[in-house]
């Protein structure tokens, strides 16, 4: 579904270096790493928001490297929700369909579908400023799914929420994925969140994809000290190499 091949993006002093990643159709993958690692740059590159220095992006078996964002069938939900403050919830949700000049009957049907999905019919006439953090997140997700995207990109969707709301939205994301099986790439700095949601995890740091695998593999068999420390492994100990010997080393 998503194939990223040797992606390089330069933004000022930051470079996303030779990033390669494969996300299967219907998979929920979480990209995890510290702040400034390149997680959001990776998402926005897939969405077509940055020019690439090198590399290719393939979506649904077709090269999308040069496609404009509006032709990629990809939607992105940001940490701050990016809702239009002057529009009602209803107008926010159908904004993408109206920009595409979708038939009014189809727009109405799509609106009803996502409103029922999230249980937000009582919010339709309200403005974003009057909503709670959890309600804004549901509206942002409803807007993203209203256009029936092939790929859903989530940029730190839980990080600005209080603990109870974070747990509720996490359960909502799991429920939605079970129902819809939309290919999803979710970025976070929280390893526990990545383990809870990801069918596979990609660890990224310093602009590089360090390791990709199921959560248990990342935790039990990290391929570097960076991954081990980020996965909160407790079996890292300081040591001094005393003398290398044939077939082994003495510490």
Where are these regions (language model features)?
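Conserved beta-strand
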Residues: 4-7, 14-24, 55
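ABC ATPase nucleotide-binding domain helices that frame the ATP-binding cleft
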Residues: 40-43, 139
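Helix-to-loop junction immediately C-terminal to a conserved catalytic motif
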Residues: 47
């Amino acid at each position: 579904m998503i194939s990223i091949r040797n992606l390089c993006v330069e933004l000022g002093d930051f470079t996303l270096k030779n990033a390669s990643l494969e996300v299967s159709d219907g998979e929920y993958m979480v990209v995890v790493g510290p702040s400034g690692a390149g997680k959001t740059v990776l998402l926005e590159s897939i969405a077509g928001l940055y020019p690439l220095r090198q590399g290719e992006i393939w979506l649904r078996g077709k090269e999308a490297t040069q496609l404009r964002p509006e032709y990629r069938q990809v939607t992105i939900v940001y940490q701050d929700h990016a809702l239009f403050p002057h529009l009602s919830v209803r107008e926010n949700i159908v904004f993408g369909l109206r920009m595409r000049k979708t038939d009014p009957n189809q727009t109405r049907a799509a609106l009803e579908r996502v409103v029922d999905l999230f249980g937000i019919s009582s919010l339709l006439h309200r403005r974003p400023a009057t909503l709670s953090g959890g309600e804004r997140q549901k509206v942002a997700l409803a807007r993203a799914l209203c256009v029936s995207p092939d790929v859903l990109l989530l940029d730190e969707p839980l990080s600005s929420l209080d603990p109870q709301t974070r747990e509720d939205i996490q359960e909502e994301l799991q429920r939605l994925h079970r129902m819809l099986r939309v290919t999803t790439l979710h970025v976070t700095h929280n390893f526990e969140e990545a383990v809870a949601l990801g069918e596979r995890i990609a660890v990224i740091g310093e602009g590089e994809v360090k390791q990709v695998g199921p959560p248990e593999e990342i935790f039990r068999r990290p391929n570097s000290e960076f991954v081990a420390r980020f996965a909160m492994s407790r079996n890292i100990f300081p040591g001094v190499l005393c003398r290398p010997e044939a077939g082994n080393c003495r510490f």
